[in-house]
């Protein structure tokens, strides 16, 4: 004997424009239950690149959810700390206070750099 299939379109459909973000990574939450974002995966990225839509790809992957700006020390290449009281940037490694470059990078990249620094691995950004 047969039973009715309970999968209905209204239970499956999901979309969103703006919604909750994960505090740690600053990226959209996962899943329909959490009103999460739709994943723009590797195959979708490769398809857009092959069609020559590089600005669209950068906008979806980087600008829409993950952009972050930092100041990088030109002497040692590490991300500089910012002092709110004195309104200055300071490199804690080489005590530099003047020679910095403004860099925009994904927040996930900055998070990975910080995790590597906790393991005593110093990734350096070379700016020219």
Tell what function each PLM region has:
Residues 1-128:
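Long insertion/accessory domains within large nucleic-acid-processing enzymes
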């Amino acid at each position: 004997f047969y039973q009715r299939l309970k999968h209905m379109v209204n239970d499956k459909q999901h979309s969103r424009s703006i919604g909750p973000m994960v505090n740690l990574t600053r990226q959209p939450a996962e899943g329909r239950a959490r009103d999460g974002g739709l994943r723009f995966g590797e195959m979708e990225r490769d398809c857009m690149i092959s069609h020559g839509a590089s600005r669209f790809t950068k906008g979806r992957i980087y600008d829409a959810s993950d952009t972050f700006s930092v100041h990088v020390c030109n002497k040692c290449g590490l991300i500089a700390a910012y002092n709110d009281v004195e309104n200055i940037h300071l490199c804690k490694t080489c005590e530099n206070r003047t020679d910095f470059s403004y860099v925009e990078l994904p927040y996930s990249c900055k998070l990975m750099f910080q995790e590597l620094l906790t393991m005593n691995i110093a990734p350096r950004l070379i700016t020219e």
